[in-house]
Design a protein with these regions (language model features):
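Asp-based, Mg2+/Mn2+-dependent phosphohydrolase catalytic module
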Residues: 1-124
């Protein structure tokens, strides 16, 4: 439905190709594997592949330290979404805890609070 509305999508991931292809079984979208986010190269490559300018793009991600920081480096608008947590991913869980404290700090400081939302709210 997204593509029917004229929007373009691309999956920019630090995962390898076999893992990404499992996610894309039902999604018709190009991808960039091993993107090395938050380095900007992958973001620029994504813009080039989609044929859009950074001002025309919005990056959607679930990790502050990779997705959002990388998009900010490139100057791309971005949206932080609530993440799915799997018990087997303890390394990511530790990073998420740190992200949670940073986001709470930003909300307390009222800096960018209008952009952060409440992604840690348990209600869906």
């Amino acid at each position: 439905q997204i593509h029917n509305s004229g929007l373009k999508t691309l999956l920019l991931s630090n995962n390898d190709t076999p893992r990404i292809e499992r996610f894309l079984e039902n999604i018709d979208s190009p991808y960039i594997a091993d993107a090395d986010k938050p380095k900007p190269d992958g973001y620029y490559k994504a813009l080039e592949m989609l044929g859009v300018k950074k001002e025309e793009a919005v990056f959607v991600g679930d990790q502050v330290f990779t997705d959002i920081c990388g998009a900010n480096k490139v100057g791309m608008a971005n949206i932080l979404v609530k993440f799915l947590q799997y018990q087997s991913e303890t390394k990511i869980g530790k990073k998420r805890t740190l992200e949670k404290y940073i986001l709470k700090f930003y909300k307390m400081k009222k800096k960018y609070h209008h952009r952060i939302g409440d992604i840690f709210n348990e209600r869906n």
